[in-house]
Amino acid sequence: MGGAADMRKKTKDRHSWKTGFTTGSCAAGAAKAACLLLKGLHQGTEVDIPLPQGERLQLPVHRWDRVEDVAWVSIIKNAGDDPDVTHGLEVVARVQLLSQRGEILIRGGRGIGVVTKKGLQIPPGESAINPVPRSMIQAAVREVFPQEEILVVIEVPEGERLALKTLNPRLGIMGGVSILGTTGIVRPMSEEAFKNSILPELDQAVAYGHKAIVLTPGNYGFKVAREQLMVPEEAIIQMSNFVGFLLEEAAYRKIEKVLLLGHIGKLIKVAGGIFHTHTHVADARMEILVAHAALAGMDQNSLQTIAELPTVEGAAEEIRSKGWGSLLFKLAERASHRAQDHVHGELQVGTAFTLLNGEIIAWDDPAMEIGKEFWHWPPVEEEFWRK
């Protein structure tokens, strides 16, 4: 086992690309720095915040000021080597002390989008500040004001203009950008750099003797694999958008079985034969879902309702509520068939779809068999949703 452990250390050392930080980290850092300013503490050029996974992050402060009982600070978004339209964006937090005891109230101001459609992580009518960034803001503020009632208003001065370059208008998020992030860190997704960093991880899985691995797009699937399926960390490969590439490389390394595990909005593309899942390359998620629903015999009104929903997750929940849960299982099966065809049958592939909350909502028989054989398959209400 020592050799494999050494390989893990070398693998991490080879990651030479630059990471960045999310808009969620910017908002949390600006909020904490503004609280320090409001409290009369020294305002330096950097601010230190806690991250969701227990690490800490130092962020450079861009501008700041205090007018009477309101303090504001801005931080410039740095996406590192990741190609991100929000790179260089100024994120502002304005804070005000309301009372000596109470909650932290988080609001979206100028340049923050407002959710207008259901099916997203934030309900309609609320500012598009996602749950993890909200938690990060609260944790950062509480390091300065442990129990006080604080109003935090997040603003992005260029948000309304920049939002037109994002998916927000299509998702029904109007008037600005979203505050996003699940870890606080932006990890580069440039193709060559990212692919080169993943291949040693596959080699590592082989060195550990794993005949089966999990391929997942990112952090959500990684968490499900670790916590629900009990998959060893070195057998979980975060593939980003490069499904076809990772399937080919896994087959080349004589790995026998692969579980595709991740959010339905990403992996449903594989059911349509899409093996590079970045939105700018191919985005037929809803079209694939509606087409298969029509082939299964769903009525026209239901098809119209599903097609008008802003996200695949919302559509999947609507499908389940209408008693068509079996369709999602068939789509998982279809994704596995397309994946196996992609590598000419050199791998056995199973597919499992999740929601953002980690619930496994659909899978095919190979996915369950791989899970039971190598790791753990959580008790789920299969027969209920297959109906």
Curated annotation (Swiss-Prot):
This is Cobalt-precorrin-5B C(1)-methyltransferase. The gene is cbiD. It comes from Desulfitobacterium hafniense (strain Y51). Belongs to the CbiD family. Gene3D superfamilies: CbiD-like. Coiled coil: none annotated. The keyword Transferase applies. Its EC number is 2.1.1.195. It catalyses: Co-precorrin-5B + S-adenosyl-L-methionine = Co-precorrin-6A + S-adenosyl-L-homocysteine.
